[in-house]
């Protein structure tokens, strides 16, 4: 096929890294990859091993209201997002956001890992799921001020600064099957 760019999804790149090395790994013209799910701990090794120059990582979900795109080729990031979002402190043991004394969420500092939430606005709506109860369970209210609402993505990301983020981990759902989180 002589392709120079390919797409990837999820753990595909990790599976390739776990495979035994082969002489075929650089016998291609592929210099760019676009997709989602490239783990930061394999990013550089993957590029070196397979001869990839650019990885254009994306972040989005069909039900969500926040997306990122790595159009500037910053290694180890999902890029930046033009939509309103926040990265908040999250207690993994309690499986819940961390709240301040006034009952509001606390944003992480640059370099810290937290829960990615997308602000629900007229221009950035949350279309949600077909199940109204599931919708209620993923909407956080009064996050920073009375009356605001955010979509809980269920994903941990690192705040890189410059409105860039790095995907770290998914909290609950492990994979999608026929368009549904399983």
Residue map of PLM features:
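Short secondary-structure boundary micro-motifs
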Residues: 40, 70-71, 100, 139-142, ...
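Alpha-helix termini
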Residues: 20-24, 93-101, 142-145
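Gly/Ser/Thr-rich phosphate-binding loop
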Residues: 1-9, 17-90, 105, 125-126
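Conserved phosphate-coordination/catalytic loops
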Residues: 37, 181-182
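Mobile, glycine-enriched helix-loop/loop "lid" segments at the mouths of ligand-binding/catalytic clefts
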Residues: 77-99, 127-130, 134-140
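Intrinsically disordered, low-complexity regions enriched in small/polar residues
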Residues: 10, 61, 87, 92, ...
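Aromatic/His-enriched, Gly/Pro-containing loop or helix-boundary segments
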Residues: 13
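Conserved ATP-binding/catalytic segment of the ANL
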Residues: 104-181
């Amino acid at each position: 096929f002589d392709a120079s760019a390919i797409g990837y999804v999820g753990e595909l790149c990790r599976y390739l890294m776990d495979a035994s090395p082969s002489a075929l790994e650089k016998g291609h013209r592929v210099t760019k990859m676009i997709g989602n799910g490239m783990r930061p701990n394999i990013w550089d090794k993957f590029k070196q091993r397979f001869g990839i120059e650019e990885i254009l990582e994306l972040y989005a979900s069909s039900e969500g209201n926040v997306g990122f795109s790595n159009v500037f080729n910053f290694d180890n990031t999902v890029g930046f997002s033009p939509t309103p979002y926040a990265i908040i402190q999250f207690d993994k043991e309690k499986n819940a956001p961390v709240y301040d004394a006034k009952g509001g969420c606390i944003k992480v500092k640059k370099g810290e890992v937290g829960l990615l939430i997308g602000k629900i606005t007229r221009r950035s709506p949350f279309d949600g799921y077909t199940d109204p109860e599931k919708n209620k369970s993923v909407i956080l209210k009064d996050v920073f001020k009375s009356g605001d609402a955010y979509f809980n993505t269920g994903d941990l990301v690192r705040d890189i600064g410059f409105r860039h983020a790095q995907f770290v981990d998914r909290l609950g759902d492990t994979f999608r099957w026929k368009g549904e989180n399983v």
